[in-house]
């Protein structure tokens, strides 16, 4: 059996890809989103109540659809990274990366020795299709896409070095954490924050890597697309449900 291709990684050098945050932590909700036309979904393990089994259920639900899953971890824990890779995650997003040294350690956590220190699960893992994928350990890195998040002043200052780290495929900017750290809470459109976002984008592209960002507001998303961001999350499932519910109720209750 051949190693499954990673459609998210394959599409990074094409047109802007639009995605949605998936926070309900169920395969049922993720599968509904997969039918709507989004190019990718972020299965959020940082702020949503996801654990390894719920992430697995969502990966399985999305497998039948042309909607690529991206899995975000809660932290930099190599043991968790190993588990997420073993259940078949091919595109992994890691939050709060501030230095190239951190980025290099994360790359190593996704690679087998001698190029890293990922543990060997063999036939126990969905990633190998329980041993059916030939030469999995030798080629797994080819379809792995590692995205690191820059969402602090330190990360922005080190964006060039982070982006240049071998094995890092993309940088994802966290505009809301950036705006909070700089004292512009809830205002990622503040000129200071916008300048930091633009700097990170330029540094990422200068290194030949892809850049992504979260932009639930349409005006922001369109501006970032014009700037050249390669992948943009334009919605959050929980927010979309709440907004639709509020609009429905308001039509009847005023």
Curated annotation (Swiss-Prot):
Instruction: Name what cofactor the protein needs.
Output: a divalent metal cation
Name the family the entry cites: Belongs to the HpcH/HpaI aldolase family.
Q: Enumerate the SUPFAM superfamilies for this protein.
A: Phosphoenolpyruvate/pyruvate domain
Annotated site residue numbers, Transition state stabilizer: 72
Q: What is this protein called?
A: Hydroxypyruvate/pyruvate aldolase
> Entry's Pfam families?
HpcH_HpaI
Q: Which GO terms describe its cellular component?
A: cytoplasm
